[in-house]
């Protein structure tokens, strides 16, 4: 078995502080942001955006915490949440969060959104944030796409069968993520060199801006402001480190602060020189983007690839040991875990409480040669996640035919310690698919990374908008669509009806199974096309609502073209969405086909009555469907055929979609925890699922229906073409811990996974835990404080999850090998 390093006392202390911290929201940043919005309200959007960032960064409180190796925070209080406006907007904090002895409002354990979180906020901060909200509402502040909508949109919304209940909500937050910033470009150049490129263009065109160049003028001017602001942020921390050094009595700590200040001064403008500076420059840019971009999801990219040259140099020069380097990596990833962002409504529930999607990619291949790229930092990332029992960030290991067995072993051991991490991703499928589906050059395809949950993107050269630009995952709820199709277009959950032009009757009106599928195709095409149309509407508004020059300065293509990422300036552009829980719909179609059309065991009229009755009074029928009808995930072609049908239908419809920014719509079959939230608003389905129960997660089989082991799941999964899904896939499997207690067990799981990859499988993630342990954790959470599990698109501490999400994990089938 893989042997992990020990954890240093300093990292142990730091880890306990991070895990057990009280997250304090504050109004400071939102207040500064509101002041800046008023001050610069008449500026052009491209200039206004970086000017607001500059004002906030000039004035926001900063601090350096005890035991930190790296600096930079989103909030000013105890690694807090500077986005607490979301808390106040979504929650009646004044009347539902009690004030405890420390004088702060604390989130109660039964809060519907922020349950089980150690969150607190001062009454005066709540008051300030409430005043800002009320002022914005009174002024009807900002461009809000929902104020005017394309004809027919309200009819679509009323169905409540998609992520578009209302575009963006209030205030509008069009997510300029998920994405991978150009960390490698920044490390190579530094801010001063990037700024010089922009300033040279401005100097060459001073007083003579003609034709299309006015847009470029605005962009390059914004780029200079962005660079100046990033430099300012880093220098503020350098000055603070010097202040700490001046007042520090401990000689060792004093020297550390002085060295930190010197390094920060250097990387404020120049490229990093060593491993610590590289990590700090990446961290500071990450903070810069988060301060600027409230709703965005900025991932860490190919962390091991862009940091290894600096560590290699330090090791060769003898200025750093491997153990010291591991301590730095440990600290870096603990620091990432201090970033917290409260979200809005469904986003908060589906993306994970405070989850920031800082997906980190390791392994894979060298872009220029295609050779295996695994290096010592690859192992250090896994060691940090496993030894420190971290749930954030998500880590993906890119696996190819030449991936070393040692990193496989390390990955399996990590999965045993922190559920679902790393995600195992198949280079042999993804690299050629990126070229075919997205049009990437070979080197850029080999250099791909993962973002958010498990979406696929280029490394600092791509603006992928993998979940669209509006709401949730920009998708439709496929199980609700089926309920509507068999009920003459009516959603049984709310009584809303689709337009007559896409309604084909009731289940008993379809004389053949092909007629039912034709009706489903008509409804699904109308629904998904509307979803894409609403995304395109918000995409069209996007450049004047949310230009993103702070990101554009490191994104390949933007500085060359003089165009912001929101305007299509990146080298590659795409957008997309995801289909969560297709197995629920596939199993429902299989059940209808089996029970009505093939075996003729029940009439269509009676079957429909059972579904509309939420199976009440029909339990024997429901049990027969569950136990007799074949289900996806068991290597049964009868059931797998319908999953392939659903997958191909989704992909086929989506090929027609495009925006003004790009011509590529990417399909995905993943979700964060959408399947739980979607299930809450989905009526009973023909597969025997009851109203309110979760639908299947991501591209996985329905909970508990995969009963023939992992190999059977893999056979079913590869019944369709994974290469079509360049927005990402997620296949979750729960493995019983006893299966991996020996080296033979670990090797067997590795071999099964490799065989799955050889057959065209793209991704898999393993929760190595048994239901007995999870039930114990429910009863005694204090004994399982650090138990990490994978939901679908993110990992979480089991004891911090809602009861519905805990129940979903427990309900999944356990597999032995």
Language model: regions and residue ranges:
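A conserved hydrophobic secondary-structure block that centers on an alpha-helix together
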Residues: 244-254
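Conserved catalytic cores of very large enzyme subunits
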Residues: 2-223, 256-259, 263-266, 270-817
């Amino acid at each position: 078995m893989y042997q992990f390093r020990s954890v240093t006392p300093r990292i142990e202390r730091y880890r306990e502080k991070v895990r057990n911290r009280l997250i304090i929201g504050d109004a400071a940043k939102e207040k500064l942001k509101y002041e800046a919005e008023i001050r610069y309200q008449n500026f052009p959007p491209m200039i206004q955006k970086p000017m607001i960032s500059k004002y906030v960064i000039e004035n926001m409180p900063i601090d350096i915490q005890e035991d930190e190796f790296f600096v930079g925070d989103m909030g000013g209080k105890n690694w807090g949440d500077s986005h607490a406006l979301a808390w106040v907007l979504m929650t009646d904090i004044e009347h539902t969060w009690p004030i405890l002895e420390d004088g702060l409002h604390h989130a109660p354990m039964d809060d519907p959104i922020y349950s089980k979180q150690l969150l607190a906020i001062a009454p005066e901060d709540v008051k300030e944030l409430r005043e800002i909200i009320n002022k914005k509402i009174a002024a009807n502040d900002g461009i809000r796409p929902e104020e005017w909508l394309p004809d027919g949109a309200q009819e679509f919304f009323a169905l409540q069968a998609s992520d578009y209940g209302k575009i963006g909500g209030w205030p509008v937050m069009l997510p300029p993520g998920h994405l991978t910033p150009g960390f490698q470009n920044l490390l190579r150049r530094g801010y001063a060199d990037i700024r010089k490129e922009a300033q040279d263009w401005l100097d060459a065109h001073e007083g003579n801006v003609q034709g299309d160049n006015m847009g470029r003028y605005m962009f390059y001017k914004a780029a200079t402001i962005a660079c100046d602001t990033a430099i300012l942020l880093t220098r503020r921390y350098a000055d603070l480190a010097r202040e700490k050094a001046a007042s520090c009595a401990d000689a060792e700590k004093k020297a550390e602060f002085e060295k930190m200040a010197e390094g920060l001064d250097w990387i404020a403008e120049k490229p990093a020189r060593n491993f610590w500076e590289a990590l700090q420059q990446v961290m500071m840019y990450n903070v810069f983007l988060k301060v600027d971009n409230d709703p965005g999801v900025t991932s860490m990219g190919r962390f091991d690839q862009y940091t290894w040259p600096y560590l290699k140099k330090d090791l060769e020069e003898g200025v750093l040991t491997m153990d010291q380097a591991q301590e730095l990596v440990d600290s870096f990833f603990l620091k990432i875990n201090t970033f917290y962002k409260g979200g809005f409504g469904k986003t908060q529930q589906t993306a994970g409480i405070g989850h920031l999607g800082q997906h980190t990619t390791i392994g894979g291949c060298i872009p220029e040669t295609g050779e295996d790229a695994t290096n010592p930092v690859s192992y250090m990332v896994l060691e940090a996640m496993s030894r420190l029992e971290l749930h954030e960030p998500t880590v993906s290991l890119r696996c190819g035919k030449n991936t070393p067995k040692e990193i496989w072993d390390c990955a399996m051991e990590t999965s045993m310690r922190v559920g679902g991490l790393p995600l195992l991703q198949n280079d042999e499928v993804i690299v050629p698919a990126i070229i075919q589906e997205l049009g990437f050059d070979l080197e850029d395809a080999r250099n791909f990374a993962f973002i958010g949950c498990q979406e696929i993107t280029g490394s600092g050269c791509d603006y992928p908008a993998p979940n669209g630009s509006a709401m949730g995952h920009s998708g439709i709820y496929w199980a609700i669509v089926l309920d509507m199709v068999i009920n003459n277009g009516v959603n049984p959950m709310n009584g809303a009806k689709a337009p007559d032009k896409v309604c084909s009757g009731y289940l008993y009106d379809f004389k053949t199974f092909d007629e039912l599928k034709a009706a489903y195709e008509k409804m699904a095409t109308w629904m998904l096309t509307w979803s894409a149309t609403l995304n395109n509407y918000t995409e069209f508004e996007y450049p004047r609502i949310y230009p993103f020059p702070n990101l554009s300065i490191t994104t390949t293509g933007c500085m060359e073209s003089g165009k912001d990422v929101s305007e299509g300036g990146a080298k590659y552009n795409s957008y997309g969405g995801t289909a969560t829980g297709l197995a629920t719909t596939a199993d429902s179609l299989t059940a209808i086909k089996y029970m009505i059309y093939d075996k003729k065991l029940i009439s269509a009229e009676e079957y429909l009555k059972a579904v509309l009755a939420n199976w009440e009074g029909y339990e024997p029928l429901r049990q027969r469907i569950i136990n007799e009808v074949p289900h996806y995930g068991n290597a049964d072609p009868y059931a797998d055929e319908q999953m392939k049908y659903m997958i191909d239908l989704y992909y086929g419809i989506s090929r027609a979609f495009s925006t003004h920014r790009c011509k590529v719509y990417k399909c995905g079959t993943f979700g964060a925890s959408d399947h739980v939230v979607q299930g809450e608003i989905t009526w009973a389905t023909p597969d025997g699922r009851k109203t309110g129960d979760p639908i299947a997660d991501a591209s996985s089989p329905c909970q508990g229906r995969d009963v023939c082991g992992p190999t059977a799941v893999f056979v079913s999964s590869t019944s369709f073409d994974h290469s079509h899904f360049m927005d990402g896939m997620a296949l979750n499997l729960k493995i019983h811990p006893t299966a991996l207690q020996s080296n033979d067990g670990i090797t067997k799981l590795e071999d099964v996974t490799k065989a799955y990859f050889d057959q065209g499988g793209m991704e898999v993630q393993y929760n190595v835990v048994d239901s007995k342990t999870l039930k114990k954790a429910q009863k005694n959470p204090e004994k399982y404080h650090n138990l990490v599990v994978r939901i679908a698109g993110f990992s979480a501490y089991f004891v911090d999850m809602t009861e519905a999400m805990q129940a979903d994990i427990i309900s999944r089938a356990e597999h032995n090998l």
